[in-house]
A protein has these predicted regions:
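Conserved small/polar residues in nucleotide/adenosyl-binding loops
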Residues: 401-407
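Conserved nucleotide-sugar donor-binding subdomain of glycosyltransferases
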Residues: 75-128, 243-250, 254-256, 337-346
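N-terminal low-complexity, Ser/Thr- and acidic-residue-enriched intrinsically disordered segments
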Residues: 1-73
């Protein structure tokens, strides 16, 4: 049987699946890797003074992982730089925040090349290689240059940008050309697949063939739409676990007969958090009778704190949450509970079940599994309501929610 090799920036295989703290994607990939006796390869999250190329092989709850340390310069140029200051804002239609530094691009190319050089000796002839996300776009090209002829697939977890925006990226053609060393490229939605096709055909003079096939740069690649889901049974088990039930009871008691609105988002300018809080402020201003009757629980773990734009959004959100609470709170009621911390999966399931409204209102987002987890957590006899941005990947195939424009205040 062929092995599965997963390649991603960070290895998210849980050390203890029973703990319930891992995300749904990590749990699903770990299950597939256990089934196919696979390997999960990526950055360890650690830095070293000098690149060694040493790979540490570990077992995490039955999943074999291969971990590589990076130099501090690699982290600064490849991860904080090109991945998160250049590609991330561009792919989320924020070219005003995108930073184009030559050293960032050089670091991105260098780290992908180094990863390929370390991974190549571990690959067996029948292995299937599955590369994940924008950090690793050139990976197939670098593996092919080392003589790897295995099947290699790529899945993009973010949106793909419109052609008119992508061309603002220096060497955009080189980036897209490197993707034609994959055999299969997957997207969450038809929209993003179509945008990729539009670039290839209109900008690079490529041609369509068959169903989802593209020919360009002297090579052929197959594209497909594969909207990621959640493990519903696993999430229900988390909701019904001891901690999940205890969290639900705790939140129900804490609400004190008030209706809870919940938002759970990593701190990121793409999530529409400022617009969400401003909309909630407008809602309280326009609906005085609802003051004291509802509250917003906004769970927002800090991320990418080394990037200036993330420091800026954090400061603005801190100030905005404080302003709203200062303006509307009473001695026994606080309109916003704003928390910069993480919670375990079973705790989140309990929180979702207790919330009467779930807010998932990004300005531009990948699939956003919070939307699906919120729905899965509901009591089918008395479900809450999901308000979902039209610009989340989860909005494309659904009919179970209220779609909204995240830039329009709640009314």
């Amino acid at each position: 049987m062929s092995r599965l090799i997963v390649v991603s920036n960070r290895v998210s295989a849980p050390t203890d699946p029973a703990a319930g703290s891992a995300g749904g994607l990590a749990m699903a990939l770990s299950a597939a890797l256990r089934k196919y006796d696979g390997l999960w390869f990526g950055w360890s999250g650690e830095t070293v003074d000098h690149w060694t190329g040493e790979v540490k092989i570990e077992d995490r709850a039955g999943v074999t992982v291969g971990l590589v340390d990076l130099e501090a310069q690699d982290v600064d140029e490849y991860y904080n730089g090109y991945a998160n200051k250049t590609l991330w804002p561009l792919f989320h239609h924020r070219i005003d925040l995108a930073q184009y530094e030559r050293s960032y691009g050089e670091g991105y190319e260098r780290v992908n090349r180094r990863f390929a050089e370390v991974l190549a000796p571990l690959i067996q002839p029948d292995d299937v290689i599955w590369v994940h996300d924008y950090h690793m776009i050139p990976m197939a090209r670098d593996l092919r240059r080392l003589g790897i002829r295995n099947r290699i697939g790529f899945f993009l977890h973010t949106p793909w940008p419109a052609r008119q925006l992508l061309v603002t990226l220096p060497h955009h053609r080189r980036l897209v050309e490197s993707m034609f060393d994959f055999d299969l490229i997957g997207f969450h939605t038809r929209e993003w697949s179509d945008l990729f096709t539009d670039y290839v055909v209109s900008e690079a003079q490529g041609e369509l063939f068959g169903h989802g096939g593209l020919e360009c740069f002297g090579r052929r690649v197959q594209t497909g739409v594969f909207p990621i889901g959640i493990d519903v049974d696993g999430f229900l088990a988390a909701r019904n676990s001891t901690l999940g039930a205890r969290t639900y009871d705790r939140m129900a008691a804490s609400a004190a007969f008030r209706s809870m609105i919940v938002g759970v988002d990593r701190l990121d300018y793409s999530k529409g958090l400022e617009e969400r809080l401003l909309g909630y402020e407008q809602f309280l201003h326009d609906n005085a009778s609802m003051r004291g009757e509802v509250f917003l629980l906004q769970v927002t773990p800090i991320s990418r704190d080394d990037v200036d734009s993330y420091q800026d959004i954090r400061s603005r959100l801190d100030a905005l949450a404080g302003r709203i609470n200062g303006a509307f709170a009473d001695m026994d009621w606080q309109p916003i509970r704003y928390l910069n911390r993480t919670y375990r999966r079973d705790q989140l399931a309990g929180i979702y079940r207790a919330a009467r409204v779930g807010l998932v209102t990004p300005l531009r987002d990948g699939m956003n599994l919070v939307a699906k987890e919120y729905v899965a957590a509901q009591n089918p006899d008395d479900p809450g309501v999901l308000i979902l941005s039209r610009f989340a990947g989860a909005a494309e195939p659904v009919s179970y929610t209220h779609l909204t424009l995240p830039t329009i205040p709640l009314v």
